């Protein structure tokens, strides 16, 4: 496939997640409800780095701006003051501090922003109205399609936004204000769907063309865009969800941003043909909305659903998700998808190297031998040579096949948030490794 853009990261082998920092406080006007400070974020980042064995991680911070998540879009120029560290003069300084410190832990700090939503409390809102950069009803009035944080949420008209020069002005200001984020080479743009405009009429296709120009402009600054969805809009797609149902894209419509957006948080409505022809290095998923595909291909765990101050067991939950979802996702992403067969729950995918992944039972085999059996696994850790991750949710004891003929011994390490702990050496006999796995403990195993 001839790619229009070259990405800064191979997202198919990174760990990409959000961290929720703050939301507007609905009970106290002009206040922010802090979920996690910059200081606390770094503490999580250190522990996650140990759990994930130092692989490259990209964190998109949610609620870093103004009063928190979804506040004052389409502006994104001020750091949330409630997140400031005591020892810093400004919240901006604290944000920059976190970005610098995270690099020590193989972690990239960036932001979760939005090019679609517009609220009337944004300083630039009047400019959007005057520039024709908002979706309008047939009567010419801006159309508040959704509602968040108790405020009407208007949508930007991508064509008007781009052609008016307003998009370039907004993004230039963002990149100039936060050079350390621009240097990260990646941002997450939430809900980047296209909507029809009715005054003047602008079709979905025209909006898609403008969206491509917006993505290309961001890339001209050296920055990749990841986003929320797989974008497969058609002109028959309604602007507003009907009867409260999700605004869903059609499976029959082509993927519009392949080669432009390398990763989506929610991947869905892809055909089997698209799944086979689109390499994860070009486009990969956080998770699939379709359970069957999620059980076959795995993906990038939504760590932000786990890493919360009100979750006292987040470490065990994180190790579980990393071992049973992230590790198999990275492993399968390293292989070529050859064929998808079966139907519904009996669906499976054949990969290169003799690997088959089954939806039923969430099993993975190599040359007919089990390497993942539901929540029990002994899988290659593709980031390090001759290294495996072993885990069992309910405990397990069995022989696992070793496919490397020259290995005679295995060093076993327990994975913890404070670093790996050496456990023991285990001999490899006749390409078999006998391991007793206590429940809910992750192990890193290095073959010698």
Language-model regions, residue ranges each:
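Extended acidic/polar, glycine-enriched regions
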Residues: 1-8
């Amino acid at each position: 496939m001839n790619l229009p853009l070259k990405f800064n990261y191979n997202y198919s082998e990174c760990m990409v997640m959000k961290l929720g920092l703050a939301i507007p406080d609905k009970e106290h006007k002009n206040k922010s409800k802090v979920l996690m400070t910059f200081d606390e974020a770094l503490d999580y980042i250190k522990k996650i780095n140990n759990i994930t064995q130092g692989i490259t991680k990209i964190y998109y911070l949610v609620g870093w701006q103004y009063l928190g998540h979804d506040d004052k879009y389409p502006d994104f120029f001020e750091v949330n003051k409630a997140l400031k560290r005591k020892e810093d003069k400004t919240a901006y300084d604290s944000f920059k501090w976190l970005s610098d410190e995270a690099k020590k832990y193989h972690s990239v700090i960036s932001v979760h922003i939005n090019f679609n939503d517009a609220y009337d409390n944004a300083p630039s809102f009047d400019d959007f109205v005057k520039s024709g950069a908002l979706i309008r009803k047939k009567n010419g009035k801006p159309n508040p399609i959704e509602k968040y944080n108790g405020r009407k949420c208007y949508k930007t008209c991508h064509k008007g936004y781009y052609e008016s020069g307003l998009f370039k002005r907004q993004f230039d200001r963002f990149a100039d204000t936060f050079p350390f984020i621009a240097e990260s080479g990646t941002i997450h743009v939430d809900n980047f769907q296209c909507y029809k405009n009715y005054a003047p009429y602008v079709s979905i296709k025209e909006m898609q063309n403008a969206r491509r120009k917006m993505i290309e402009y961001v890339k001209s600054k050296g920055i990749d865009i990841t986003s929320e969805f797989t974008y497969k809009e058609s002109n028959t797609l309604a602007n507003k969800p009907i009867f409260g149902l999700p605004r869903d894209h059609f499976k029959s419509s082509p993927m519009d941003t392949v080669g432009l957006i390398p990763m989506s948080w929610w991947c869905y409505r892809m055909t089997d043909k698209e799944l086979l022809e689109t390499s994860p290095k070009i486009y990969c998923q956080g998770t699939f909305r379709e359970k069957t595909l999620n059980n076959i291909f795995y993906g990038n765990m939504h760590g932000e659903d786990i890493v919360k101050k009100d979750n006292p067991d987040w470490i065990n939950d994180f190790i579980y998700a990393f071992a049973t979802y992230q590790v198999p996702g990275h492993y399968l992403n390293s292989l070529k998808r050859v064929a998808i067969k079966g139907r519904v729950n009996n669906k499976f995918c054949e990969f290169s190297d003799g690997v088959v992944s089954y939806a039923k039972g969430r099993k993975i085999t190599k040359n007919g031998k089990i390497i993942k059996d539901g929540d029990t696994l002994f899988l290659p850790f593709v980031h390090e040579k001759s290294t495996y991750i072993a885990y069992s949710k309910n405990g397990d004891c069995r022989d696992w096949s070793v496919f490397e003929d020259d290995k005679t011994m295995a060093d076993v390490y327990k994975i913890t948030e404070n670093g790996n702990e050496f456990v023991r050496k285990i001999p490899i006999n006749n390409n078999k490794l006998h391991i007793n796995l206590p429940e809910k403990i992750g192990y890193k195993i290095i073959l010698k």
